[in-house]
């Protein structure tokens, strides 16, 4: 494929920049801290906050866990604080990353040794052996179109703050593009969640590569228009590959020089709150993404399904996130599909998903894409998964060996939805 032809040059530049990333986190550890009853859970949370430690996940409930990142200069204080909460707690902590910088470097080595495909311009599943640069992701989408020209074309959904086009692929069937109800997939709105990029691309590749060989897949592609955007936060994604592997937000300045970026998934103009930016929908990425969703729902073909892919946590959730008491108008139907997706997802590798509304399943989240797509854009179904990284203990820095299994289990879940949506 063309990405391979350009890879030697692209990766030469990228690999030159990558060593700066592990140096940021050299000696940093990531721990999983088990929590007991609610009082202990709250105490651990306050302790972590007092030390100003970044958390990868928070305890969703009592008798859960908190994944926390601890730099080497805070290690002694962290262990002492654990003992102050409970004298036995320090012995129960699990180390997720002994040296986060080394883990990031290992992940980057996998990228730099990506397989070279001799078939220039053709998309193959060798792509899913490793992670890739942003430039190569764009090339891969173009390779998909070149490989499957009768069923795919490039689409865009606005631009980022730094001027990058938000690029996706439209997959369509025998009736042509734009004639069937829309299914829209977003990936990597949180820049550090690289697995979301690969999984959305694997779903796209699977739909296209099976169109002519599977009557079932052909029926799905003929029935719906798929719009798949693997990277909806391109500025943040590029920043994770050049400066800080664990960056989450976009790169839009704020009024504070020390606080850069909007959380694009708290910026949607529905039940928005101040942590999502200066005003609702003020991130350029959101403006373009919202306009694209609204255009699909206002078209004659209509809007069927929206999914915003995230990592990590092994969850599959629907509306609402803004309130734990609000219920979707078709809550029972959403619940049914969530549970069916989870069963299909579990079949290949035994990974169990927790399902339910966002707010009651993980935490309250205002200004999120799922609520917007469901309540404003009027997509019939709206979901968000949290993918792998929890049970393996790798979190956001997921080894390349987990890419393909992640895509396979998600694809099984997607096929369930396509077969069972009303």
Show the residue positions of the predicted features:
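M14 metallocarboxypeptidase catalytic domain recognition
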Residues: 2-6, 11-422
């Amino acid at each position: 494929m063309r990405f391979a032809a350009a890879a030697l040059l692209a990766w030469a530049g990228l690999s030159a920049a990558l060593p700066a990333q592990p140096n940021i986190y050299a000696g940093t550890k990531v721990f999983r801290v088990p929590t007991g009853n609610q009082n202990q859970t709250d105490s651990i949370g306050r302790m972590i906050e007092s030390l100003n430690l970044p958390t990868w996940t928070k305890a969703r409930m009592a008798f859960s866990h908190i994944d926390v990142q601890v730099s080497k200069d805070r290690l002694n204080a962290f262990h002492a604080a654990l003992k102050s909460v409970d004298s036995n707690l320090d012995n129960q902590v699990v180390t997720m990353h002994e040296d986060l910088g080394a883990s990031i470097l290992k992940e980057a080595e996998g990228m730099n040794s990506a397989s070279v495909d001799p078939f220039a311009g053709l998309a193959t599943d060798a792509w899913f052996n490793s992670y890739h640069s942003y430039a190569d992701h764009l090339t891969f989408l173009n390779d998909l179109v070149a490989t499957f020209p009768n069923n795919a074309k490039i689409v865009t959904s606005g631009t980022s703050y730094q001027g990058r086009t938000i690029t996706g692929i439209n997959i369509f069937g025998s009736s042509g593009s734009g004639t069937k109800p829309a299914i829209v997939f977003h990936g990597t709105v949180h820049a550090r969640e690289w697995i979301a990029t690969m999984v959305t691309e694997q779903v796209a590749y699977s739909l296209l590569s099976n169109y002519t060989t599977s009557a079932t897949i052909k029926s799905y592609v003929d029935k719906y228009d798929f719009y798949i955007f693997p990277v909806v936060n391109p500025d943040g994604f590029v920043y994770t590959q050049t400066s800080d592997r664990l960056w989450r937000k976009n790169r839009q300045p704020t009024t504070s020089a020390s606080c850069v970026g909007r959380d694009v998934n708290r910026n949607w103009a529905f039940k928005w709150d101040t942590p999502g930016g200066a005003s609702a929908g003020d991130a350029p990425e959101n403006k373009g993404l919202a306009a694209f969703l609204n255009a699909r729902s206002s078209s004659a073909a209509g809007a069927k399904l929206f999914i915003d892919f995230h990592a990590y946590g092994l969850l599959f959730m629907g509306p609402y996130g803004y309130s734990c008491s609000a219920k979707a108008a078709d809550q029972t139907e959403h619940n049914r599909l969530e549970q069916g997706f989870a069963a299909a997802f579990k079949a290949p590798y035994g990974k169990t998903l927790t399902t339910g509304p966002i707010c009651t399943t993980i935490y309250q989240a205002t200004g999120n894409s799922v609520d917007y797509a469901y309540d404003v854009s009027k997509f019939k179904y709206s979901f968000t998964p949290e993918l792998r990284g929890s049970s393996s203990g790798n979190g956001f820095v997921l080894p390349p060996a987990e890419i393909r299994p992640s895509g396979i289990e998600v694809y099984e879940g997607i096929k369930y939805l396509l077969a069972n949506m009303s």
